[in-house]
């Protein structure tokens, strides 16, 4: 669907089709146009106007069809679609308009009122030809790429992401990601982060049930309260995985996955700020 037809859609249908609001889409177009104006030699005129290029890239993330099928809809070759996707992604990333606050922001949160939630989500990938064991996730039962999310509990803002191969344990991914918290910042994580209190004292994880025993009523209440606070991260995961490129089997080169997930997370934060 080209931009002329997309303009005829209602705001609700446009977001359902693309995964972003019309206001966010227009801002992305403005960012790309500003970058294009900087070029002294624009070169050959592209077949698609900038609005169509951005819409095509968003649809690629949203539907995650092959370049071939996307090209059939837009009247482009596979290579032209690939070049356009890479170009628009690189412009949006380099503009820093959709950058995440980053790990340093966690050290600037001294108050216990700033509660953060940490969790890991997985995206399936095609079975690798080499090093299959490194990507196989026992929890998911398939080959995956892991993404660690650190989220502000009250605002639902994504602060930073970390990435790893499917086999790596959630807690080990945390240690290798370089994420550090200020001493007074309270952190909530799931059972995969058992032992985090040794690194950060103000961390809380659910109480694991002892082998052959049951949890006491107070322990169950404690776990229930933690789950109530950390449910926000599940809602954020759902919002991100509206884009099939993060939820369906990832077919592209793995080194591009981190860039794309950070960009989509930044777009999510931008939309969140619009609602505030």
Curated annotation (Swiss-Prot):
Q: Which GO terms describe its biological process?
A: DNA recombination; transposition
Keywords (A to Z) from UniProt: DNA recombination, DNA-binding, Metal-binding, Transposable element, Transposition
- GO terms of molecular function: DNA binding; metal ion binding
- Domain DDE Tnp4, chain residue ranges per copy: 118-256
Q: Which residues bind a divalent metal cation?
A: 119, 170, 190, 234
A single Pfam family it belongs to is HTH_Tnp_4
Which cofactors, by name?
a divalent metal cation
Keyword Metal-binding listed? The answer is yes
Keyword Transport attached: no
The cross-references to InterPro entries, in alphabetical order and at most eight, read:
HARBI1_dom (IPR027806), Transpos_IS5 (IPR047959), Transposase_HTH_dom (IPR027805)
Name the family the entry cites. Belongs to the transposase 11 family.
Q: Which PANTHER family match?
A: THAP DOMAIN PROTEIN
Q: What does this protein do?
A: Involved in the transposition of the insertion sequence.
| Matching NCBIfam families | transpos_IS5_4
Protein name per the record? Probable transposase for insertion sequence element IS702
UniProt lineage: Bacteria, Bacillati, Cyanobacteriota, Cyanophyceae, Nostocales
């Amino acid at each position: 669907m080209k931009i002329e037809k997309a303009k005829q859609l209602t705001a609700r249908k446009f977001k359902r089709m693309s995964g972003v609001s019309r206001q966010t889409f227009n801002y992305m177009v403005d960012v790309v146009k500003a970058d294009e104006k900087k070029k002294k030699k624009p070169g050959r005129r592209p077949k698609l106007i900038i609005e169509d290029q951005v819409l095509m890239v968003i649809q690629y993330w949203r539907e995650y069809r092959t370049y071939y099928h996307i090209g059939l809809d837009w009247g482009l070759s596979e290579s032209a679609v690939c070049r356009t996707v890479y170009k628009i992604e690189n412009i949006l990333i380099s503009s820093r308009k959709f950058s995440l606050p980053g790990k340093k922001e966690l050290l600037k949160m001294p108050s216990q009122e700033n509660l953060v939630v940490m969790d890991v989500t997985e995206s399936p990938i095609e079975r690798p030809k080499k090093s299959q064991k490194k990507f196989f996730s026992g929890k998911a039962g398939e080959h995956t790429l892991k993404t660690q999310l650190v989220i502000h509990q009250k605002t639902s803002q994504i602060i930073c992401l970390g990435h790893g191969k499917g086999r790596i344990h959630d807690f080990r991914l945390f240690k290798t990601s370089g994420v550090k918290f200020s001493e007074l910042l309270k952190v909530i994580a799931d059972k995969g982060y058992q032992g985090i209190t040794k690194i950060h004292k103000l961390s809380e994880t659910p109480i694991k049930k002892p082998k052959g025993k049951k949890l006491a009523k107070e322990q169950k209440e404690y776990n229930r309260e933690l789950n109530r606070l950390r449910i926000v991260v599940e809602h954020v995961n759902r919002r991100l995985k509206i884009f099939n490129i993060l939820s369906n089997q990832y077919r592209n080169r793995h080194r591009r996955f981190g860039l794309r997930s950070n960009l989509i997370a930044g777009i999510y934060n931008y939309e969140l700020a619009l609602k505030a």
